């Protein structure tokens, strides 16, 4: 009986800790913590041949102008889990033709940042988050090159913020 009571207490204790953690991750305190940025500038120019061994790329390239993208982030809650992950991981950037509009691509990312700049459990899931960081940085010709200064500031901030969250979660595991 004592062993059973102890196991029940332990289970309840861990459930309470998980709930407290969820509240903390969604709090302004955590948002401020992962928003702390040092002034070091990171310059990254990805090499596609290195990425080829990590990422299965679709040989067929698409033009971003061929897609309807007006309210993609607001409509994403209606997607099934697999499509939701694909959309928010941004791995679809690898299928875009580099001649696609940089302005449209940057506008899509800017809209995503406006909708999701704070932690959201399903969107900031480690698998989705790590793929998103890889996709955004690796496709810098579309996501960053020739962008306006305000966009670059917003982009750099969210990359660093997501990276800080990723580091926190890796340290925790």
Task: Give residue ranges: language-model regions.
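Acidic-enriched, low-complexity/disordered segments with a strong bias for Aspartate over Glutamate
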Residues: 38-39, 58, 66, 75, ...
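Extreme N-terminal leader/anchor segments
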Residues: 1-74
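Aromatic-lined, polymer-binding surfaces characteristic
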Residues: 81-173
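Generic alpha-helix detector with strongest preference for long hydrophobic helices that associate
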Residues: 1, 5, 73-77, 113-117, ...
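Short charge-dense sequence patches
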Residues: 37-45, 54-64, 79-91, 112-113, ...
